[in-house]
């Protein structure tokens, strides 16, 4: 039964690992390589300590219906979701415009992203997770195709020359590991719920891979190389094969960003939608994206406010994670009192 449980949930775990590891660890590793350089390889492993503590305190068997009755949880979830999606759509649209279509207004890419993600938000979570797995498969096929092109062995080609560091920072803030807890809020919709053991394994993989990426990058150049960069080109596994280099690392980063946007924006919206009565869910999604649109355009026109959005995202993410952990324990006790068979 235990093996069957993990086999049936394999697509969920693959999506969790990919969107929290292969993407977040790239940006996370870049920060610590630039700021800590010499000792940066050990920091992701040390980060596992607070993550493990939070997971061990968390009760994965809680009933999400209990959380949905907590007004503070619903408010924080809504605020966090809106800020998260605003930043993610803004970042992906900026990267599309900066990297490839400089003459096309960024607002066009933002509007297209909003329309597509709004449409995807009407899917149920299992269909969305399977779509995310298809996007991952597409990326796996995309990388070998790029490596068919040969370029000179030149490290300068790998730098993020035009993409502002604040935009890259937005990637990290929108891929932090509170998602691991948010996945469990969909437990009633999975065939088998996500277990605490699975969360521990996934978080370990995320941070171990981040450490390995840093160690491998230091075999390519000296750590002082990264101290001089605004945003170091990091993932050698993607950008380097023997004597060949992938010239435009931003193409791969853009693909990661866009696939993450088309998955995570609906993921966040569906989670908020599920806290409401079914007869209000369709209207809510339309109002949600109607309200989201001016926020994205505001950020496009007022670039300096990105820092404020990232600070608010960090605060709401932290508070939301703490509330989920606290009320998961109360929720379990509450449910066991009402229905001892669960």
Regions found by a protein language model. Give the residues of each.
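Hydrophobic, membrane-embedded alpha-helices of multi-pass small-molecule transporters
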Residues: 7-27, 43-54, 77-81, 85, ...
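Hydrophobic alpha-helical segments and their helix-loop junctions in multi-pass secondary transporters
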Residues: 82-93, 137-161, 217-218, 321-333
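Membrane-interface loop-to-helix entry segments
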Residues: 87, 107, 120-150, 309-321
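Membrane-interface interhelical connector segments
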Residues: 219-248
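Extracellular/periplasmic helix-loop-helix junctions in multi-pass membrane proteins
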Residues: 280-285, 294-315
